[in-house]
């Protein structure tokens, strides 16, 4: 009987019986654009689009019939539903006890079994045909003897929910797909029999409980080359080994296709005698050359003794593909493991590094990974030469061997590609390791990937929130959490960078121990950092180096268009910078705005602690604070390189015996086209300048507008605290006030000058304590002023026995072509003049 039409609606009380007296049964065929099965009493939809019903079930108000009507009909007839327009959806539970067949066909779309389908009768069958894919969202159970299931789809079949599975538990049950017949396995003995035909096609008819039995790997030193479809069923409670073989797993090696399989409570172990070829061990397969998809392993334990490659699911993925796989459990590589991974020990391309013939996609590992060797360990993959795409690892990765390479996702990415992947958890390494939240050692490409958690190692390590050591490309990636190391290179994103980091970000608490190097984004940079940022909180202990973005930027290092916003704290004898602790390379178009704080005898700069390279078109806005006998600058603490077109606006404060400048503390290099606006203060004796505290280099076309203050016996200048012999200042100016304590040298432009000052001006106010020497241009001049001007107000305090002059209190050098105007015009040019003053 055929019911055909554009829209068909079968009444709920319809009864169809095609049984004959001869024992044969006919079929009821429904062909329509709305040939779907609905749950009873659900509401609305339009054709081809499912909408949530009142009971949160997807429903078709225009469905041809409901599940109860279909179930009743299957008791008295075979039923064939054909959707002529779109997807055919079974949205209500269907069950029957007869030997009849349910046939479901979608001529133009998918067949979706969203609710349970169950038949208990002998010879009952279900046949599904789809132009697209068959999706099974619930249980499909055919439990009678000689039951048959047939699934035919251009795009195959998938089990889309965790509880979805097929049961074919009766005697002589059968299965076929796309014209191919499969053997149905019901027990451990059936698994063992796969050895007889390694090119065969198999399905699991039900879950298999091994009850703790020992099980030798399928294969007998040969690869499986057939099809093994678990149909959503689980194999559980086995103890797998493979004595005498280099590959250990449920399958020794897979060169075929394994899909839709669960593995639970399985322990797998490889023991490799000394001197033997390393073994590959994984719960599912030692080697994979084929295709693995939709495999879920839970509560598994994988371990090795001797040289081995160890993975939670696969030991070695050699040019194979693993998609939509997951592992939950424990992986232990022992003392001699080469590579250890939560999902795969290694992922190796046979074509070329980074080729997708070795592919892990949409997969996940939640595994505790432990290794005591100096090899590689990763939460997902130990060693990757292929592609890891849209995959995730969570849990703990702990490598205790010196020199190991450890990553939350991948231990070593050697020419491989990691894309849109994540790791979260706790990643730890020992001495001299490369440890990264995502990748331990990267010599490939990391794109659009993230880590969230804790990364830690001891001394001599390279520790990064995302990558421990980078010799490849890191792009558009992020790290959040904490990165810790002893006397190590520690970075919020990368511990040590020798290649490229771009468009990336870190928000990490970064902590390096004594003599360690810490950077908010990168610990040690000898490569290129471009368009990246961090708001990491960075700390380094005594004698360490700390930078808001980079700890140390080496001579080959470049920092371009990048920024740091977090605070930087360093201990005694340390070097700290808001952007870079030490710069021997190039910084261009970059900025920092966090506070910088350091202990005694330290060097602290708002942007860079110590600069021997180039700082260009960059700025800092954060405050800088350090303890006694330190060198501090609003932009750079100590400069022997070049500062060009850069500025600082944060306040600078430091203890006694220190050198402080609004831009640079100590300059032996070149400063040009630069400016400083912040207040500079030295508590006690020191050298303090609105721009430079102590200058033994060259300053040109620069300015300072902040106030400057220092204590007793100091050299204080609106622009330069002390300008040394051989130093020069040109085309520069100061407009802030300068104040010194007792016995200080205070100048509107320079506190104490032994060098050359040309074409420069001052226009602030100078003042001091008892016996202070105050000058509109310099407190004391032993060098040369050429074409300098001052409008400085010299504020004398009655009774303080101060010395003052419009140019200088003391002149033992030369003033040439200089002038005093405004508040300075009515004063003697010098209080004591033992040099020359001429037009």
Please give the residue ranges for each predicted region.
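Alpha-helical scaffold domains
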Residues: 9, 32-34
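Surface-exposed repetitive/solenoidal architectures
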Residues: 35-839
């Amino acid at each position: 009987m055929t019911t055909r039409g554009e829209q068909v609606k079968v009444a709920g009380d319809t009864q169809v019986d095609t049984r004959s007296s001869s024992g044969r049964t006919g079929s009821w065929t429904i062909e329509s654009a709305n040939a779907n099965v609905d749950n009873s009493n659900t509401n609305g939809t339009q054709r081809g689009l499912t909408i949530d019903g009142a009971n949160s079930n997807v429903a078709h108000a225009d469905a041809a019939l409901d599940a109860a009507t279909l179930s009743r009909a299957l008791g008295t007839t075979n039923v064939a539903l054909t959707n002529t327009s779109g997807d055919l959806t079974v949205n209500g539970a269907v069950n029957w006890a007869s030997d009849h067949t349910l046939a479901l066909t979608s001529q133009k779309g998918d067949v979706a079994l969203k609710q349970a389908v169950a038949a208990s009768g002998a010879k009952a069958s279900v046949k599904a045909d789809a132009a697209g894919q068959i999706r099974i969202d619930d249980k499909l159970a055919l439990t009678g003897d000689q039951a048959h299931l047939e699934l035919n789809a251009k795009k195959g079949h998938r089990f889309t929910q965790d509880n979805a599975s097929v049961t074919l538990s009766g005697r002589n049950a059968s299965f076929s797909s796309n014209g191919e017949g499969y053997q149905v396995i019901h027990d451990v003995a059936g698994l063992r029999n796969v050895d007889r035909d390694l090119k065969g096609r198999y399905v699991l008819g039900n879950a298999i409980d091994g009850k703790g039995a020992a099980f030798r790997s399928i294969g007998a030193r040969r690869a499986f080359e057939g099809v093994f479809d678990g149909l959503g069923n689980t194999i559980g409670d086995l103890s797998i080994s493979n004595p005498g073989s280099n590959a250990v797993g449920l399958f020794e090696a897979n060169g075929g296709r394994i899909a839709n399989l669960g593995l639970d409570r399985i322990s797998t172990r490889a023991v490799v005698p000394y001197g033997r070829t390393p073994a590959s061990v994984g719960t599912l397969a030692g080697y994979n050359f084929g295709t693995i998809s939709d495999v879920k392993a839970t509560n598994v334990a994988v371990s090795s003794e001797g040289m081995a490659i160890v993975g939670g699911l696969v030991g070695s993925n050699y040019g194979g593909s693993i998609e939509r796989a997951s592992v939950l459990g424990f992986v232990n590589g022992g003392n001699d493991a080469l590579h250890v991974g939560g999902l795969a020990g290694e992922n190796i391309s046979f074509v070329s590094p980074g080729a997708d013939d070795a592919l892990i996609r949409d997969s996940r590992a939640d595994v505790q990974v432990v290794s005591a060797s100096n090899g590689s360990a990763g939460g997902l993959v130990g060693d990757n030469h292929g592609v890891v795409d849209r995959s995730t690892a969570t849990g703990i990765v702990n490598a205790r061997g010196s020199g190991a390479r450890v990553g939350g996702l991948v231990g070593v990415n050697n020419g491989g590609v990691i894309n849109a992947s994540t790791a979260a958890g706790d990643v730890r390494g020992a001495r001299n390791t490369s440890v990264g939240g995502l990748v331990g050692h990267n010599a490939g490409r990391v794109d659009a990937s993230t880590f969230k958690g804790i990364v830690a190692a001891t001394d001599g390590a390279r520790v990064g929130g995302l990558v421990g050591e980078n010799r490849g490309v890191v792009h558009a990636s992020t790290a959040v959490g904490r990165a810790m190391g002893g006397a190590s290179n520690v970075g919020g994103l990368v511990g040590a960078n020798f290649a490229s980091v771009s468009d990336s970000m870190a928000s990490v608490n970064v902590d390096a121990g004594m003599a360690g190097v810490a950077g908010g984004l990168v610990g040690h940079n000898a490569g290129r950092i471009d368009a990246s940022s961090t708001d990491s909180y960075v700390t380094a202990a005594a004698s360490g180096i700390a930078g808001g973005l980079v700890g140390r930027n080496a001579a080959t290092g470049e920092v371009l268009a990048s920024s740091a916003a977090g605070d930087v704290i360093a201990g005694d004898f340390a070097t700290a910078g808001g952007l870079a602790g030490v710069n021997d390379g190039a910084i261009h178009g970059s900025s920092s705005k966090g506070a910088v704080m350091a202990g005694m005898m330290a060097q602290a700069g708002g942007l860079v602690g110590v600069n021997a390279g180039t700082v260009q078109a960059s700025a800092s806005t954060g405050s800088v604070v350090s303890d006694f006998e330190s060198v501090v600058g609003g932009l750079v603490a100590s400069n022997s390189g070049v500062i060009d077109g850069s500025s600082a606006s944060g306040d600078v404060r430091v203890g006694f015996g220190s050198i402080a400048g609004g831009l640079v503390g100590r300059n032996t290099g070149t400063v040009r086209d630069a400016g400083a606006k912040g207040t500079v203060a030295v508590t006690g004796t020191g050298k303090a300048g609105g721009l430079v505290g102590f200058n033994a280099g060259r300053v040109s076309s620069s300015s300072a507008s902040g106030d400057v203050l220092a204590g007793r016996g100091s050299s204080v200048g609106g622009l330069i605290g002390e300008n040394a012999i051989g130093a020069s200042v040109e085309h520069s100016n100061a407009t802030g006030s300068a104040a010194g304590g007792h016995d200080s040298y205070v100048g509107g432009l320079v506190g104490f000058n032994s060098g050359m000052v040309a074409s420069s001006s001052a226009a602030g106010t100078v003042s001091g304590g008892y016996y202070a020497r105050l000058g509109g241009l310099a407190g004391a001049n032993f060098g040369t002023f050429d074409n300098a001007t001052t409008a400085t107000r010299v504020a004398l305090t009655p009774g303080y026995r101060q010395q003052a002059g419009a140019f200088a209190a003391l002149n033992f050098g030369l003033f040439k072509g200089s002038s005093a105007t405004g508040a300075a015009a009515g004063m003697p040019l010098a209080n004591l003049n033992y040099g020359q003053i001429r037009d």
